[in-house]
């Protein structure tokens, strides 16, 4: 019946579901030949994806292969070559690895309960993955730099195509929320899908960045990352959002190992830090609505050692109610009013675009911010923990393993 949905007719002859790729295609005559050609091309593209529902053998074979995860150290010390051979090696690794990882996620979409998998928005994301698999597997073997350059164009296109996947998944699950009976199954699906997406984007962006000659960077790895500087960048961003919504924002004090520098990948911090800072600022402002221009500071402490980096964010936002404490790290698919839920659970700052530059798309709303940050931290060999002092405030502990520390690093 999923196939019937893709083809445009509902189950058992019911009303047609919204097609996966936006407006329904119509092959009726158009007033101009250009319009006709456009729609024929769209129909042809869509037919390829539909055909894949019949012929899944390539996806099935790829899904049975294990992914080959790299440590950041491997990526950092793979070296540069004058003849560009490091780029060919990196591209060939991606050409082998990306289809396998995408096939794993397609298998994950198939495992969803039928009624959820039929949701048009979820189907749209499912199709994005199938289309990506087809484009990647159709690409010929990379033999020279010209092939590698064309492969980079494909990778950029796919990164752009998938930039809104987090928001789409949240919307689709919100639309299907009344059909969700096993929340553990959905949480497992989301954890795997979102962390796999992070890994794929990190690997793909790393390869593209290898073409750049940026000081203190090898690909996406910063060789001298300053936690203080990246925190300050996102503090400024979160304060602007907070001022836009509330007319004011808490001051932020940073202490601890403020001079620390070490090799690290900024990208996961660029996903996680805005969420944690927005949470702290919103909780602070919401709990001081009577005195919005006299609010307590948010305090951030950096602790660096030879195994991991710990960032503690402490707010005086009243803490988390006992009834909400056990579920703040769960994915929530409702949009309840802030007056009836802890600010960390309800959508954060409405639906503003929270990531300038569009690097990751908005990771907000629908109660996805904290659980997604938790999943990312765990994927990177770390953790995200909350300690609530009800009536006072909340301490959030973000722990991330070093890529060149005394213990084995995480794998991407």
From Swiss-Prot:
The keyword Magnesium applies. Its EC number is 2.7.11.1, 2.7.11.4. Residues 159-404 form the Histidine kinase domain. It is found in: Mitochondrion matrix; Mitochondrion. Pfam families: BCDHK_Adom3, HATPase_c. GO terms for cellular component: mitochondrial matrix; mitochondrion; oxoglutarate dehydrogenase complex. Serine/threonine-protein kinase component of macronutrients metabolism. Forms a functional kinase and phosphatase pair with PPM1K, serving as a metabolic regulatory node that coordinates branched-chain amino acids (BCAAs) with glucose and lipid metabolism via two distinct phosphoprotein targets: mitochondrial BCKDHA subunit of the branched-chain alpha-ketoacid dehydrogenase (BCKDH) complex and cytosolic ACLY, a lipogenic enzyme of Krebs cycle. Belongs to the PDK/BCKDK protein kinase family. This is Branched-chain alpha-ketoacid dehydrogenase kinase. It comes from Bos taurus (Bovine). The gene is BCKDK.
């Amino acid at each position: 019946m999923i196939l019937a949905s893709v083809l445009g007719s509902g189950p058992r002859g019911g009303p047609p579901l919204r097609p996966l790729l936006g407006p329904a295609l119509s092959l009726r005559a158009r007033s101009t030949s250009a319009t006709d050609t456009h729609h024929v091309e769209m129909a042809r593209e869509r037919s390829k994806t539909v055909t894949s529902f019949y012929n899944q053998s390539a996806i099935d074979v790829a899904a049975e292969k294990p992914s080959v995860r790299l440590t950041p150290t491997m990526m950092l010390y793979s070296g540069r070559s004058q003849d560009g051979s490091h780029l060919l090696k990196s591209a060939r690794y991606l050409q082998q690895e990306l289809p396998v990882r995408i096939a794993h996620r397609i298998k994950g979409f198939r495992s969803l309960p039928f009624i959820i998998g039929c949701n048009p928005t979820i189907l749209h994301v499912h199709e994005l993955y199938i289309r990506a698999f087809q484009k990647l597997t159709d690409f010929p073997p990379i033999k020279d730099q010209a092939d590698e350059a064309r492969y980079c164009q494909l990778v950029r296109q796919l990164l752009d195509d998938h930039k809104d996947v987090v928001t789409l998944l949240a919307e689709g699950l919100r639309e299907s929320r009344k059909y969700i009976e096993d929340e553990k199954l959905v949480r497992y699906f989301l954890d795997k899908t979102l962390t796999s997406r992070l890994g794929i984007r990190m690997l793909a962006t790393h390869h593209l960045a290898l073409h750049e000659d940026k000081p203190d960077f090898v690909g996406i790895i910063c060789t001298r990352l300053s936690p203080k500087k990246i925190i300050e960048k996102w503090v400024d961003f979160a304060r602007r959002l907070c001022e836009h919504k509330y007319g004011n924002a808490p001051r932020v004090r940073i202490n601890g190992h403020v001079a620390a520098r070490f090799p690290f990948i900024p990208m996961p911090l660029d996903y996680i830090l805005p969420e944690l800072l927005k949470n702290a600022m919103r909780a602070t402002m919401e709990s001081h609505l009577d005195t919005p221009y006299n609010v307590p500071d948010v305090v951030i402490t950096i602790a660096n050692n030879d195994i991991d980096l710990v960032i503690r964010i402490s707010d005086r936002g009243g803490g988390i109610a006992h009834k909400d404490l056990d579920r703040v790290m769960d994915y929530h698919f409702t949009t309840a009013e802030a007056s009836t839920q802890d600010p960390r659970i309800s959508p954060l700052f409405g639906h503003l675009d929270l990531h300038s530059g569009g690097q990751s798309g908005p990771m907000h709303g629908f109660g996805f911010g904290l659980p997604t940050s938790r999943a990312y931290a765990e994927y990177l060999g770390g953790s995200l923990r909350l300690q609530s002092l009800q009536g006072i405030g909340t301490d959030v502990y973000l722990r991330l393993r070093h890529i060149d520390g005394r213990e084995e690093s995480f794998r991407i």
